Amino acid sequence: MNFTVIIPARYASSRLPGKPLADIAGKPMIQHVWEKAQQSGATRVVVATDYEEVARAVRGFDGEVCMTSSQHNSGTERLAEVIEKLAIPDDEIIVNIQGDEPLVPPVIVSQVAQNLQKYQVNMATLAVKIEDVEELFNPNVVKVLTDKDGYVLYFSRAVIPWDRDQFVQLGKADLSQLQLHQHYFRHIGIYAYRAGFIKQYVQWQPTTLEQIERLEQLRVLWNGERIHVELAKQAPAVGVDTVEDLEKVRSILSHV
């Protein structure tokens, strides 16, 4: 199947400035992400950036780059600009991989594209089971709840569903004894959409729920569209948000 991967690579980061160019095993981080996307079988891989040094690095390893505005409020807005500039057809499948995911498994890149095509929805994504109590209660871990067919009911930074009886019985002091049931899933921030849907998405105004949760995918649910979720065939390792994350990834790739 044909699909295009777009990798937003924003240079300015409050926690780790310049991270697309951070050296990992002798290559800039963005090159690792690009290589994983290439290995997925994508028809085309484009890096979208607002910083010339990142663009120069991408050209240096023969990657395709699209310069974008630095004024975007979200990665989805950056995707929409790329689609317009490159005249990508409305029915083209677009997979969005974040530029700070140098360990993303290529198999899940193709999986999310196939998920979109299989279920004939405008947007698809992936999740993995939560098996750790600390992860469950971590607001930086986005939880996703679906119906019986895998269509999203809600995304939240809070614990969903809330196991009332078990939580009340254990109390905060005994959460280590919590029995995690099969309905707890961590959302993986990789998406597939039709190009035309991305153009539609950016026409919608930000919604109350997405502003409260700081999760832009809630705009899709608010406007009555469906998102399908599959369990990822392979759980991705850590992304790079902090210096500590960067050191973990460097350690992993130094042994590859």
UniProtKB/Swiss-Prot annotation:
Family indicated by similarity: Belongs to the KdsB family.
Biological role: Activates KDO (a required 8-carbon sugar) for incorporation into bacterial lipopolysaccharide in Gram-negative bacteria.
Ranges in a coiled coil: none
GO cellular component, one term: cytosol
HAMAP family: KdsB (MF_00057)
PANTHER family given in the database record: 3-DEOXY-MANNO-OCTULOSONATE CYTIDYLYLTRANSFERASE, 3-DEOXY-MANNO-OCTULOSONATE CYTIDYLYLTRANSFERASE, MITOCHONDRIAL
Compartments where located: Cytoplasm
First-listed, main subcellular location of the protein, grouped into a coarse class: cytoplasm
Gene Ontology biological-process entries: CMP-keto-3-deoxy-D-manno-octulosonic acid biosynthetic process; lipopolysaccharide biosynthetic process
Keywords: Cytoplasm, Lipopolysaccharide biosynthesis, Nucleotidyltransferase, Transferase
Record-linked InterPro entries: Cytidylyl_trans, KdsB, Nucleotide-diphossugar_trans
Organism whose genome encodes this protein: Histophilus somni (strain 129Pt)
Signal peptide: none
GO MF terms, alphabetically ordered: 3-deoxy-manno-octulosonate cytidylyltransferase activity
Lineage of source species: Bacteria, Pseudomonadati, Pseudomonadota, Gammaproteobacteria, Pasteurellales
Name of the protein: 3-deoxy-manno-octulosonate cytidylyltransferase
Pathway the protein acts in: Nucleotide-sugar biosynthesis; CMP-3-deoxy-D-manno-octulosonate biosynthesis; CMP-3-deoxy-D-manno-octulosonate from 3-deoxy-D-manno-octulosonate and CTP: step 1/1; Bacterial outer membrane biogenesis; lipopolysaccharide biosynthesis
Keyword set includes Nucleotidyltransferase: yes
Entry EC number(s): 2.7.7.38
Catalysed conversion reaction: 3-deoxy-alpha-D-manno-oct-2-ulosonate + CTP = CMP-3-deoxy-beta-D-manno-octulosonate + diphosphate
